[in-house]
């Protein structure tokens, strides 16, 4: 069983779920994984962070990811592999420039009888906006067009 809990793009302002998501993520990350009475417990934790800068746009992008996997021995009747694996991950991304800021946060939890392949990590290059901001030039209008008065059409 695996599920993505929430993905919030667009920041926390005006989002009624933002506070609940933060609380849930903190709760999920602080929970002890695994079976408290189990023997032969193995745990692995990974923390990663990357940053990109776009000087031409005065923009920055950041991604941080925390992941913890716990496994423990279990009877073959419970799990054919003889182990149970639980993984929890918290991923946060942010893109900001002088005119905008985008934040995204996702929590992930899985529990399985065999180690699951890690889902693809989000890439900052695919996540950051690809369209660059180009201020539009003012449209030019002819002076004759600006002075023209509307014409009335009579129907009779």
From Swiss-Prot:
Region Homodimerization: start-end pairs: 38-54
Modified residues (Phosphoserine): 71, 79, 137, 140
Residue spans of biased composition, Basic residues class: 144-156
Chain spans, region RNA-binding: 57-156
Assembly with partners or alone: Homodimer.
Family statement drawn from the similarity comment of this UniProt entry: Belongs to the polerovirus movement protein family.
Annotated source species: Potato leafroll virus (PLrV)
Keywords for this protein: Host cell junction, Host Golgi apparatus, Host membrane, Host mitochondrion, Host mitochondrion outer membrane, Membrane, Phosphoprotein, Transport, Viral movement protein
Biological process according to GO: transport of virus in host, cell to cell
Subcellular location: Host cell junction, Host plasmodesma; Host chloroplast envelope; Host Golgi apparatus; Host mitochondrion outer membrane
Post-translational modification: Expressed as a nonphosphorylated 20kDa form and a phosphorylated 22kDa form. Phosphorylated by a host PKC-related kinase. Serine phosphorylation is required for plamodesma targeting.
Region (Disordered): 106-156
Keyword Kinase found: no
Domain notes: The N-terminus is involved in homodimerization. The C-terminus binds ssRNA. The C-terminus is phosphorylated.
Protein name: Movement protein P17
Cellular component aspect of the GO annotation: host cell Golgi apparatus; host cell mitochondrial outer membrane; host cell plasmodesma; membrane
Described function: Together with movement protein P3a, facilitates long-distance movement of virions in host. Transports viral genome to neighboring plant cells directly through plasmosdesmata, without any budding. The movement protein allows efficient cell to cell propagation, by bypassing the host cell wall barrier. Binds ssRNA.
